[in-house]
Regions:
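N-terminal low-hydrophobic presequence detector
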Residues: 9-12, 186
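Non-catalytic structural scaffold of enzyme domains
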Residues: 20-418
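Hydrophobic h-region of N-terminal signal peptides that target proteins for export
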Residues: 11-19
Length: 418
């Protein structure tokens, strides 16, 4: 049975400098050795020596959380499509674009790799995600390459953004790369509306350990920042069978531990929540409710956390700001689609490959905890997981319900996947 690290209300780990040379060099060399894109984690080099404008946009996450980012992109309408000027025109800014989504569900949650000393392996996983999007090959046939990559995962952005940019540069590809962390920080800066209180960054343990949000936020605000890292919430939202605790109870326990620590440290009152995991917008109401629960909680005739939580909490969802960053990058590079796509979006997820020698499988067919977190990097082409189409039927029931109710544009696109 898999076990997960307990929630961490604040992570104070210092992440060592990433060994960019070895991990990135291995992925770069692997792809360069296979310019025909005929093996795992490779792409057809010739695909990127032509006009890329009508290629799809690639979006990836460790699971289904990135669908919240895809939804924000598909709904984004901040500009007139005819003139390109600021101002909504009733037509989504990306109406003419097609998307390829990939969720690395077999290897999630990404947030726990750093805590068990597997940061370099996580970085390799992230580069493999990128190579899948860039390439054509998948287990059942072929898919189109992509002209842009959106890292719709905070942990993957924190640990992989610079690696991806370095690899894309080494391959000589004119591919746009956008991450969610800087976009989230910019979103907070542009929507502060006079808020002066503390910012609570809600994320995975791995994202907290990277310190990516405090660093990014320090560039745009002097407001105090405190992190709440959860090791199980993203997995619970995914419907991971090893996480039996109800989502509401996980959130309530995480927030309670976070506020207990904040009270002990005499931290600044919190008035803004940064949804620093792409899964969390799916349960944003439950998160706000948990803060309200503890704000009003009485113990020994007093409310110990009332002064720590504002009566109204502002939420910052980096997804919408990621959409705007993507639009600006595509527009600035003259890479917006020329011909509106009539083809549907494509969705893929990873699943364990039982045919891979030595793969460790649990009774439910997932990777065992020991195998998943025991792997080492420098095997970019390994296929202990394979990528297959994501269909509504492949989503756990509770997850499918969240997507159907809260991400209608994405759910509609998913209906066409078979």
């Amino acid at each position: 049975m898999r076990t997960y690290l307990r929630h961490a209300w604040c992570v104070v780990l210092t992440v060592a400098a990433f060994a960019q040379d070895e991990v990135v060099a291995s992925a770069v060399a692997h792809a360069q050795a296979h310019p025909e894109g005929d093996v795992s984690a490779s792409f057809v080099a010739a695909d990127y020596r032509r006009d890329l404008r009508d290629l799809p946009i690639g979006v990836f996450d460790s699971g289904v959380g990135g669908l919240t980012v895809l939804e924000a992109i598909k709904a984004h309408d901040r500009h007139d499509n005819r003139t390109g000027k600021e101002g909504a025109d009733g037509v989504p800014d990306f109406a003419g674009e097609r998307f390829v989504y990939f969720g690395d569900q077999a290897n999630m949650p990404y947030g726990n790799y750093s805590a068990v000393g597997r940061t370099d392996f996580l970085r390799e996983l992230i580069l493999r995600d990128v190579l899948f999007l860039l390439g054509r090959r998948y287990v059942h046939g072929q898919k189109p390459p992509v002209k842009a990559i959106v890292i719709a995962c905070n942990t993957a952005t924190a640990y992989g953004l610079e690696d991806i940019r370095a690899a894309v540069k080494a391959w000589g590809l004119p591919v746009i790369v956008v991450g969610v962390v800087e976009a989230g920080a910019q979103g907070l800066a542009e929507t502060a509306d006079g808020a002066q209180g503390g910012v609570a960054v809600l994320a995975t343990v791995g994202t907290c350990a990277s310190n990516a949000y405090p660093k990014a936020l320090a560039k745009v605000t002097a407001r105090p920042v405190r992190q709440l890292g959860s090791a199980t919430l993203a997995a619970a939202i995914e419907g991971d069978p090893s996480v039996q605790t109800p989502i509401r109870d996980i959130i309530r326990a995480d927030v309670g531990a976070f506020l207990k620590s904040a009270a002990a440290d005499k931290a600044a009152p919190i008035d803004t929540l940064m949804l620093g995991c792409t899964h969390y917008p799916l349960v944003a109401d439950e998160i706000v409710a948990a803060f309200a629960y503890w704000r009003d909680h009485e113990s020994d005739g007093r409310k110990p956390y009332a002064a720590l939580v504002a009566s109204e909490l502002k939420q910052v969802n980096p997804a919408a700001w990621t959409a705007e960053a993507l639009r600006r990058s595509l527009q600035g590079s003259k890479m917006m689609a020329v011909k509106p796509s009539s083809a549907g979006d494509l969705f893929y997820i990873s699943v364990p490959n039982p045919a891979w020698p030595g793969v460790g499988l649990a009774a439910d067919g997932s990777l065992t905890y020991e195998y998943k977190y025991g792997r080492q990097p420098n095997q970019v082409g390994r296929e202990d997981t394979i990528n297959v189409p994501m269909t509504p039927e492949k989503l756990p029931g509770a997850t499918a319900k969240l997507v159907r109710e809260k991400l209608p544009l994405t759910w509609r696109s998913l209906q066409g996947v078979r």
